[in-house]
Amino acid sequence: MSDTHIIAGMHSVRTALKHGADGVSQVWVEARRRDKKIRDIVALSKSAGILLHQVDRSELDTIAPGVNHQGAVAQVEVPAALGERDLEGLLHNTTNPPLLLILDGVQDPHNLGACLRSADAAGVLAVIAPKDRSVGLTPTACKVASGAAESVPFIQVTNLVRTIRWLQSDGVWVVGAAGEAETSLYQTDLNGPLALVMGGEEKGMRRLTREACDLLVKLPMLGSVESLNVSVASGICLFEANRQRMNR
């Protein structure tokens, strides 16, 4: 039996129904609400043949305790990770310069979930991670992702350096974030096909991953702390890339 998790909130439930309805096993909505957002969720659930419960708000509070569920909750299967062939298909079928996020050694499911959420907001084509020494899609990661685990392809690869080399041969520029780099993120042209590489919580990028990057950049740190959480740093890098692309 597949692992399942609970997602809550209008946007999260609607995203799961639109992008991964096959993995949604049941949906609960607040019975007394009749607004358009609830009607959309009800319609999407019924059209996909998903078990739908219209219940009191107190029951939603029990299913998703301590969460601002906004009157909508769903039980969702943990999505299966994709592989190298799926990445090739995604890359060759996109019409815009791809933006990819590579996570090397992220082991905390909360961080993975937060990175997926940032990736979704930034329009990332896929999130890539190695199979070894990295967390995969878990119920916790999916819960933190708030629907992004269903909308952003998560690719697990056997050999990360080999995947980076393949991306480079296909015209993707690979930029890694490293505190000791001399070049600032804000001095770097991030237009065009791009993969941003972020290291794990403790040791950052592994040596071979670092050496495989086309360029290493740093996030200027103006305070007393030396580094940022990987999900925060990922969001900063992704949205700087988007800022540059929007201003072209």
Per-region residue spans from a language model:
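N-terminal positively charged helical leader segments and presequences
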Residues: 1-90
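Structured adenosyl-cofactor binding patch, chiefly the S-adenosyl-L-methionine
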Residues: 121, 140-148, 207-248
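A short acidic, often aromatic-flanked loop/helix-cap motif at beta-alpha or helix-coil junctions
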Residues: 58-63, 80-82, 160-164, 183, ...
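Hydrophobic/aromatic ligand-binding patch that stacks against planar heteroaromatic rings
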Residues: 44, 118, 166, 208-209
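RNA substrate-binding interface of SAM-dependent RNA methyltransferases
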Residues: 15-18, 22-23, 29, 38, ...
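Active-site/ligand-binding-proximal alpha/beta "capping" segment
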Residues: 175-231
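Conserved RecA-like P-loop NTPase ATPase core
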Residues: 9, 111, 119, 174, ...
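Short basic, glycine-rich beta-strand/loop surfaces that mediate nucleic-acid
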Residues: 63-77, 145-148, 153-157, 191-199
